[in-house]
């Protein structure tokens, strides 16, 4: 599976480079993000995943000079049959993403610390499925930002949103609304503490964009969104004819950072 993943990254790199080359030249600092979603079913799989992330994956990525990696679990895990864990990793380029994912496979410390996960038997896998989403940061939010929060990790609410559009052209309109239209600056003014805003360049629900905002707790989250929908600037922006019907479906996932997560 790892070999197939590297081939996918290589192909993606070639295609995305051609598609994004002009944009990248104008915005050389825009990051790429890899978001992995692990589906698991029980505490045994969760333990293997946590051990692998904490003692193998994050240290290996840190040795590759990736400073901040986010590891989160879905708040709904307590009652959900399909439980979820997320790993968010920022990269300077698709080439770096491909190279780092390749290099850690030759890291002896990584292979030793992650052996239970890496060498799992076919009938005792550490997860049921794994999704990989590749994202490209928005021009107005070219680099990830660390949340400025004071609450304990088990109280925080990280809100991951995915906005799907009906067609590529309509999707481009929604991306324009976030950037030139002023939606990103509005979120910043209202202190939504966003980690990233991005367009998905490889994933299962395209065309779509994804972004993550963070809050001290659920009560603060509710208060922030109430302020947002009542804001005069949002009312004006959302009523503009050119921005109508540019989102077809929204997925909202509430997450909490694991204690060993970098943010």
Residue ranges of model-derived segments:
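Bacterial Sec-dependent N-terminal signal peptides
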Residues: 1-29
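Short S/T/G/P-rich N-terminal loop/turn motif that feeds into the first structured element of a domain
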Residues: 21-110, 115-116, 120-234, 244-263
């Amino acid at each position: 599976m790892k070999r197939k993943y590297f081939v996918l990254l290589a192909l993606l790199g070639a295609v995305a480079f051609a598609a994004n080359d002009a944009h990248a030249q104008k915005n050389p600092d825009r990051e790429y993000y890899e978001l992995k979603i692990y589906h698991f079913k029980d505490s045994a799989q969760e333990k293997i995943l946590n051990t692998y992330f904490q003692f193998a994956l994050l240290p290996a990525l840190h040795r590759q000079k990736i400073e901040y990696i986010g590891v989160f679990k879905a708040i709904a895990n307590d009652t959900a049959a399909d439980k979820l864990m997320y790993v968010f990793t920022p990269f300077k380029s698709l080439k770096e993403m491909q190279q780092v994912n390749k290099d850690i496979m030759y890291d002896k410390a990584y292979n030793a610390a992650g052996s239970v996960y890496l060498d799992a038997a076919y009938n005792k896998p550490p997860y049921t499925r794994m999704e990989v989403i590749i994202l490209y940061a928005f021009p107005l939010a070219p680099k990830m930002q660390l949340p400025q929060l004071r609450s304990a990790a088990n109280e925080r609410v990280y809100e991951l949103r995915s906005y799907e559009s009906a067609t590529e052209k309509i999707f481009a309109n929604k991306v324009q609304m976030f950037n030139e239209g002023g939606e990103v600056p509005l979120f910043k003014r209202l202190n939504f503490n966003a980690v990233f805003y991005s367009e998905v360049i490889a994933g299962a629900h395209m065309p779509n964009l994804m972004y993550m905002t963070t809050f001290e707790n659920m009560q603060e989250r509710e208060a922030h969104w109430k302020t947002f929908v009542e804001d005069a600037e949002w009312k004006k922006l959302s009523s503009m004819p050119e921005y109508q019907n540019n989102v077809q479906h929204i997925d909202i996932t509430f997450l909490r950072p694991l204690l060993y997560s970098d943010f």
